[in-house]
Amino acid sequence: MDLDLQGQVALVTGGGRGIGRNIALELAAAGARVAVAARSRAEIEKTAQEINGPAIECDVSDRVSVEHMVKLVESELGPIDLLVANAGISIDEDVAWEIDPADWWRVFEVNVLGVYLCCRAVIPGMLERGAGRIVNVASGAAYLPGSESTAYSASKAAVHRFSETLANQLEPHGIPVFSISPGLVRTRMTDSNDDLPWTPPELAPRLVRALASGRLDRLVGRYLHAEHDDVDDLAVRADEIVENDLNAIRLRR
């Protein structure tokens, strides 16, 4: 299937740096018109200039801010075909009981409530048109043993479960929802970890581009890992993955 995204409108939150920036650049290179959003306009201006798209200030944990963001994108670019809910934060955490509860909860406000609010804001338009796709960026920290941050890992597990349940609700309407792990990509959030097996930064954008194209729609609701799941292999094995309930977080007995 052609991975050309000509004519599509995409919104990428957290699009000013790291994974979100790379995704925005990939989508724009594939022909999509892309808007990027972040809390600080200065953080996204460079990316917006490179993709010739709008840069929108938005606090994804604030409903009014999110709804305003979506209206701006729709007024400047048109109806949103693809949401990439990428904005996320982490905190330094040695032990959970020494963290300020407000700081701990803020991770959930951005990483979970933010994803929900962004989805909630774009879904009515997608339902009206009977088309659209949603990609929520989660993390392998949701299921890997030894995850060091209770706030971050728990929030990303919530994103996975939210995405799968939302996918079940939207599949009858023809709107696929996916959650992805971009792998361990060197970003400002992870840069303090020097001796880790970094994931090539181009893999997550490549996966999102394939999802945006519709090539992997059979895998609606699945959890896809940018490093461990090859796009071509996913397309070939899609029926097997669904029939055997693979690429899902389950309690196996």
Q: Could you tell me what each predicted segment is?
A:
Residues 119, 155:
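Active-site helix of classical SDR
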Residues 9, 16-17:
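Conserved glycine-rich cofactor-binding loop
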Residues 97-116, 131, 135, 159:
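Catalytic Tyr-X3-Lys loop
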Residues 124, 168-172:
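Alpha-helical segment proximal to the catalytic Tyr-Lys
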Residues 139:
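Residue(s) in the substrate-gating loop at a strand-loop-helix junction
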Residues 179-180, 195-253:
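C-terminal helical subdomain
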